[in-house]
Amino acid sequence: MTDATPTLTPKPWISGIAPYVPGKSAGADGRPLIKLSANENPLGTGEKARAAFAAVQSAPDALSRYPDPGSVELRAAIAAKYGLDPDRVICGNGSDELLHLAAGTYAGPGDEILYVRYGFAVYEIAARRVGAVPVEADDRDFATDVDALLAAVTDRTRVVYLANPNNPTGTLATREEVGRLYAGLPQNVLFVIDQAYAEYLTPDEDDGGLELAKTRPNVFVTRTFSKIHGLAAERIGWGYASADVIAALHRIRLPFNVTRAGQAAAVAALGDDDFVNRSRAHNARWRAWLAAELESLGNHGVRVVPSATNFLLVLFEGAVSAETVYHRLMDAGYIVRWLPGQGIPQALRMTIGTEDETRGLATAIRAALAG
């Protein structure tokens, strides 16, 4: 008779999670590359945020003291900037933490979490992490299809994620579409509007998400300081929802989740309109330029998906594949994001870089297509 030795195993739904693969910054040989794979701000970080960050770091107790667990000053600054109630603002270790909190607070085994195909990769991870069933609704030519999302809602749906603008496609759902989606959802479903790229939009493009979150009990809007504010290294996100939703999220939020220096830098960043405006203008100019350059390569099977973000999704549907272009770009010193893991093996996602980086990328793509 043999005694069975118990084995430590993770929950089955954890084993089903494919590890998140971040954008690379170096080649396989360790050679530094021009990184256009993670949608970072090519202008860096604003002077005000850098000065505030440095001031905290230079304090004698910079490392020995815990940060403010409630991010009180930062929440007040966010509320003042956007006309919100500071008690209904929550800060996170990046907006990723807040997206996970939404799933962990409102869904569990047997529940369903819904999002559009080609949505942000974290949504599936957040769903599986809590044992919920991830459900993908069909897209409409890489854009959000509201009718498909509503058709996928069941009595087990507990959370609906909408990235707007969407990552990795760059597409934007209109205010009318977002309102129609919300109107079609049951009131026991949390509608999460992930606005990581909202600061790149013009006022006319605003999707009305914050207005919904101000007045509706089941809408949670998330934003980040990682993109236009250039604070990606500090991992700072924030969200807004009803008092009841925020109170529930706080029950499982980790204390001390945003660093002291990060909080100070974020407060300063909110007051640096000049840097934000310069970043937005730079992005609009060079996104349009790069899109036009790549659209001129249509005879090579190149197609650019219209973008409202700081990146382009580019389809390679001709003789030279996206995978081939990806590797040839690395050989030329550029790293972009190839997307087979998100079901788009024919596509590359390209961050808008500096002028020199963007011009160089266009030249390298032409060379890659020429073989």
Curated annotation (Swiss-Prot):
One of its GO terms (molecular function) is pyridoxal phosphate binding. Pathway: Amino-acid biosynthesis; L-histidine biosynthesis; L-histidine from 5-phospho-alpha-D-ribose 1-diphosphate: step 7/9. It is an enzyme of class 2 (transferase). Keywords: Amino-acid biosynthesis, Aminotransferase, Histidine biosynthesis, Pyridoxal phosphate, Transferase. Transmembrane segments: none annotated. Its cofactor is pyridoxal 5'-phosphate. It catalyses: L-histidinol phosphate + 2-oxoglutarate = 3-(imidazol-4-yl)-2-oxopropyl phosphate + L-glutamate. SUPFAM superfamilies: PLP-dependent transferases. InterPro entries: Aminotransferase_I/II_large, HisP_aminotrans, HistidinolP_aminotransfase, PyrdxlP-dep_Trfase, PyrdxlP-dep_Trfase_major, PyrdxlP-dep_Trfase_small. It comes from the Bacteria. One of its GO terms (biological process) is L-histidine biosynthetic process. Its EC number is 2.6.1.9. The modification N6-(pyridoxal phosphate)lysine is found at K227. PANTHER family: HISTIDINOL-PHOSPHATE AMINOTRANSFERASE (PTHR43643:SF3), HISTIDINOL-PHOSPHATE AMINOTRANSFERASE 2 (PTHR43643). Homodimer. Belongs to the class-II pyridoxal-phosphate-dependent aminotransferase family. Histidinol-phosphate aminotransferase subfamily. This is Histidinol-phosphate aminotransferase. It comes from Sphingopyxis alaskensis (strain DSM 13593 / LMG 18877 / RB2256) (Sphingomonas alaskensis). The gene is hisC.
